[in-house]
Curated annotation (Swiss-Prot):
Taxonomic source organism: Methanosarcina barkeri (strain Fusaro / DSM 804)
Class in the EC hierarchy, top level: isomerase
Binding locations of [4Fe-4S] cluster: 71, 75, 78
Keyword Transferase: no
Binding site for S-adenosyl-L-methionine: 77, 171, 182, 190, 240, 242
Protein name per Swiss-Prot or TrEMBL: 3-methylornithine synthase
Presence of the UniProt keyword Repeat in the record: no
Gene (UniProt): pylB
NCBIfam families: pyrrolys_PylB
InterPro entries: Aldolase_TIM (IPR013785), Elp3/MiaA/NifB-like_rSAM (IPR006638), HydE/PylB-like (IPR034422), Pyrrolys_PylB (IPR023891), rSAM (IPR007197)
């Protein structure tokens, strides 16, 4: 247990994790309570040591294609919830093919096909399966799907047509908070979908939000909850209030920062993929997240893309700086580099 550990003893924490130590709940309370700059820097350093032990200076790159921003859900935190009166789009199959052409040879390890729970695809799930097949045939890369809570039959068909990874975020394992965030949606349904996907050979990603009313105990509950389906990727994202949503005016005063939780995730899941998203703070934010222990850059947009991200800190900026060339340039400055495709597929194992 590390609850009484002095600051200088944090330096050995990474070594303990590499040797097989598993954090206790009291350990998690100690780490999540850290506030001093020195304490946090030592936590980040321990997380980097663990990451570097398993992955070296290699980083994975994930292209994000948000192909439909229509959604039937009323998530209180999400800009794209069905009650928000915003401009939306749904790419045609031809537009998706054209997007794929811009990605060939660009250096991405995986393509993330994301949509809201769009009635167009939910009324005829074979449309979604066809989309997966087209992208697989065009690019031949591993495909992550983020379609919301699809039925098992559709998940199985998508797997057969080339989907490798299912991203389906719980947001929180605090059931009371969940009801406030994913309004009217089944808690168990999402857990069961990930479990089914894992059984069918998918890799799975789970994720939580922070800064949305979670405290240390509910965060521990969520961290433990993410372990239940043996996820291949674990994510935390900071809640960013979105215009036109029920939580537009919400402000959280906790000290449970995304960077702190990324480091804790690395210590809990030493061999897993942990994202450094561009969605909240762009390239500069990517650097901070990699320095906290992340090892895959997500929300990289296709070249010259006008597609949306999820939180879109840069929605109104002319220069979005979220392309793969910009990412690679910054990685090189950091002394890091894109991994080989074979490295990524070895990590996937699925």
């Amino acid at each position: 247990m590390i609850q009484k550990m002095a600051l200088d003893e944090f330096d050995s924490l990474g070594d303990k994790v590499i040797e097989g130590y598993q954090l206790t709940d009291n350990d998690l309370r100690t780490l999540l309570s850290l506030e001093s700059k020195e304490g946090l820097e030592r936590l980040y350093s321990a997380a980097r040591k663990v990451r570097d032990h398993y992955f070296g200076n290699r980083v994975f790159l994930n292209c994000f294609i948000y192909f439909s921003t229509y959604c039937k859900n009323q998530c209180s935190f999400c800009y794209y919830n069905c009650r928000n009166e915003i401009n939306r789009y749904r790419l045609t199959m031809e537009e998706i093919k054209e997007t794929c052409k811009t990605l060939k040879g660009a250096g991405f390890h995986m393509v993330d096909l994301t949509m809201g729970e769009d009635p167009y695809y939910y009324e005829d799930p074979n449309r979604f399966v066809e989309l997966v097949q087209i992208v697989k045939e065009e690019l031949g890369l591993p495909i992550m799907i983020s379609p919301g809570l699809m039925d098992n039959a559709t998940l199985l068909k998508a797997r057969e047509k080339g989907a490798n990874f299912l991203a389906l975020y719980q947001e929180t394992y605090d059931t009371e908070l969940y009801r406030k965030l994913r309004v009217g949606q089944s808690f168990d349904g999402r857990v069961n979908a990930r479990r089914f996907a894992k059984q069918q050979g998918y890799c799975v990603e789970d994720g939580i939000l922070t800064g949305v009313g979670n405290d240390i105990e509910s965060t521990i509950l969520s961290l433990r909850g993410m372990s239940t389906n043996d996820p291949d990727m674990v994510r935390v994202m900071t809640f960013l209030p979105q215009e036109g949503t029920p939580l537009e005016g919400f402000r959280d005063k906790s000290n449970l920062s995304e960077l702190k939780i990324i480091s804790v995730l690395r210590l809990m899941f030493p061999k897993r993929l942990i994202p450094a998203s561009l969605d909240l703070e762009g390239i500069d934010g990517m650097v901070l997240r990699l320095n906290a222990g992340a090892n895959i850059v997500t929300s990289i947009l296709p070249p010259d893309s006008q597609l949306e991200g999820v939180a879109n800190y840069d929605r109104d900026l002319e220069e979005r700086d979220r392309d793969i060339k910009s990412v690679v340039r910054r990685l090189e400055i950091m002394g890091m580099k894109p991994a080989r495709q074979a490295d990524f597929e070895a990590v996937l194992g699925c």
